[in-house]
Regions:
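Active-site regions of metal-assisted phosphoester/phosphodiester hydrolases
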Residues: 10, 21-55, 130-161
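N-terminal, active-site-proximal structural segment of metallo-dependent hydrolase catalytic domains
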Residues: 19-109, 113-117, 123
Length: 161
């Protein structure tokens, strides 16, 4: 009887273990709400986010925001940071380079791709990916076309494969 019970417990324990222990990964979407640098881009309407603009956007406030964004991304992953992070409202490549190289996210070896659309303020979407967990092949952006005449222009979609 003891032997049968022992075998039963062993079989039960064996069946409760997954057959293929695959490691999962996290995906995150984050609207960073106007992640602008402090440099004037004469081709875009980014004047509100200059030191002399309506938001009095200084380097100190900019770098503080980068640190806060890095904290949120790190905390979202619990033990491991998310493998993929979709970002909304990013101004340009510079802010992503600063985010990935001047914050603790530097240790995670993220890479990025982003749209470079025609938004008048220069707001784009981007994807951060950990190259050891995501095999980036390429990306393309798609403009959204509305059929109504009174539509508002929107940002391009980012398609990554």
């Amino acid at each position: 009887m003891t032997r049968t019970l022992t075998i039963f417990i062993c079989v039960l324990a064996f069946l409760s273990c997954p057959a293929n222990a695959q490691s999962g990964f996290r995906i995150m979407s984050y609207n960073v709400e106007n992640l602008f640098d402090t440099d004037d881009n004469p081709d875009k309407n980014d004047n509100d986010f200059l030191p002399s603009g309506n938001h009095h956007w200084t380097r100190g406030r900019y770098y503080h925001k980068l640190q806060q964004i890095a904290k949120v991304i790190s905390a979202a992953g619990e033990w491991n940071t998310p493998a993929l992070v979709a970002l909304c409202e990013v101004e340009n490549d510079s802010v992503l380079i600063h985010l990935l190289n001047r914050t603790p996210l530097k240790q995670q070896q993220y890479r990025y791709c982003m749209t470079h659309g025609s938004d008048t303020r220069g707001i784009n979407t981007a994807l951060l990916y950990q190259r050891d967990q995501f095999g980036y092949i390429g990306h393309r952006e798609h403009s959204v076309v509305f059929t109504r005449k009174n539509h508002k222009h929107t940002r391009n979609l980012l398609h990554v494969w």
